[in-house]
């Protein structure tokens, strides 16, 4: 446990285009090497493709994609008497959001389309429908937790 006081969470300003804190958070997740304008171009480009290609509201698609990918449980390693057990634990709401955004980013990066905006749009559309690599990752994490249910009494 840290001895100093707990550092308060920073307030993230909503993004200028959609007025959503979640979109702003997602832009920060996409950002590499501090290039926020590039990250904004990628995310807004993906949203434009979603509204153009699918004819759906990009904010609704984004929020449903993030909600679908959110994990409920995950496994954490716990050492008990010389053996490491994978103990299933419930995921905190803030971590759920962070994990789902991270998984969406990684799934988009692995796709085959040309631009990152196209890859991100495709992954968001698939995740909103309950398909795609990010959903596969979530199912994998849930499967691991289910398989190690026997060790759930080793709480943290």
UniProtKB/Swiss-Prot annotation:
UniProt KW keywords: Ribonucleoprotein, Ribosomal protein, RNA-binding, rRNA-binding, tRNA-binding
MF terms in GO: rRNA binding; structural constituent of ribosome; tRNA binding
PROSITE patterns per record: RIBOSOMAL_S7 (PS00052)
One example of a Gene Ontology biological process annotation: translation
Record's keyword annotation contains Ion transport: no
Keyword Ribonucleoprotein: yes
GO cellular component terms, A-Z: small ribosomal subunit
InterPro entries: Ribosomal_uS7, Ribosomal_uS7_bac/org-type, Ribosomal_uS7_CS, Ribosomal_uS7_dom, Ribosomal_uS7_dom_sf
Coiled coil: none
Function: One of the primary rRNA binding proteins, it binds directly to 16S rRNA where it nucleates assembly of the head domain of the 30S subunit. Is located at the subunit interface close to the decoding center, probably blocks exit of the E-site tRNA.
Assembly information from the UniProt record: Part of the 30S ribosomal subunit. Contacts proteins S9 and S11.
Family: Belongs to the universal ribosomal protein uS7 family.
Protein name, entry field: Small ribosomal subunit protein uS7
Gene it is expressed from: rpsG
């Amino acid at each position: 446990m840290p001895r100093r006081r707990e550092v308060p969470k920073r307030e993230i300003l909503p993004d200028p285009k959609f007025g959503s804190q979640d979109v702003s958070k997602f832009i920060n997740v996409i950002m590499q090497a501090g290039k926020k304008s590039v990250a904004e171009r990628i995310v807004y480009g993906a949203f434009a493709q979603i509204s153009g290609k699918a004819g759906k509201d990009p904010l609704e698609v984004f929020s449903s994609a993030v909600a679908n990918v959110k994990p409920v449980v995950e496994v954490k390693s716990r050492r008990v008497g010389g053996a490491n057990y994978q103990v299933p634990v419930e995921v905190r709401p803030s971590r759920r959001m962070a994990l789902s955004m991270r998984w969406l980013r990684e799934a988009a990066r692995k796709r085959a389309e040309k631009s990152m905006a196209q890859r991100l749009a495709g992954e968001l559309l698939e995740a909103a429908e309950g398909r795609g690599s990010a959903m596969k990752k979530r199912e994998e994490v849930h499967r691991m937790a289910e398989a190690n249910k026997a060790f759930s009494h080793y709480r943290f």
